[in-house]
């Protein structure tokens, strides 16, 4: 019995030694397999992160300058003048006010600034660049020179959609031609009263298109005469309006719309009035110009709700 127990104990010890032998294969790997590298963030996420940091940097610079001006005014209100404050706001709104102007025209606007405003603009631009370089790092900042080589506020404007082209122009009552012959009206208001223009150009009485597209053009012309103004030029008047398109690339003009009538204003009536309204959709190219011609300009009604014309873009050209 004892001998059997001793033999069984030797058998167990032998099994343990065999299990710890280096030659015996192990179940499972000795070392865990290396994990796969983390996927790189998608380009859209990187671009969003960069734009977020960009906006944060611009906001920090603007807030810093605003705080500086505030505390400077609190310490000595006489040291900061109204001109300095106006200059600061003028710099911030420089690009917004220029609209579609290119870099050459923007440089001319910058040269028109006073020396103090130009120095403030240069300091502000340098502060923006240093702040962006500090946030995104020198290597990544050097990789986006196209953003900084153009306008100094183009970075803030890249995400801003371009303004929809439109114009509403009212006649300049102080510069209406006289006579009864057909003339081109060359003096319009674009920023007075109801007149407004955006993303289009008014030059020498002609409305220039800056974007290709389909536009709705309209014109309203009113003729009037009172007996206190004297006699009319003729018993029968041809009261007409023409909306004309002029191409600059290929010098030519075409009538897009016309309207009017022949009126007899020779009666005993104290007051005569006639209104013409025309409108329509047209495909226009950048650089083309729209103008208005009328007959008997001396009879025009100069009120802003009587004689006007305009245009607005409806859709792009496919």
Swiss-Prot record:
Cellular component GO terms, alphabetical: extracellular space; plasma membrane
Tissue spec: Highly expressed in thymus and bone tissues.
Alphabetized SUPFAM superfamilies for the sequence: TNF-like (SSF49842)
Extracellular side: 69-318
Biased composition (Pro residues): 31-41
GO annotation terms (biological process): animal organ morphogenesis; bone development; bone resorption; calcium ion homeostasis; calcium-mediated signaling; cell surface receptor signaling pathway; cellular response to leukemia inhibitory factor; cytokine-mediated signaling pathway
Pfam families, per database record: TNF
PTM remark: The soluble form derives from the membrane form by proteolytic processing.
Protein name: Tumor necrosis factor ligand superfamily member 11
Organism this protein belongs to: Rattus norvegicus
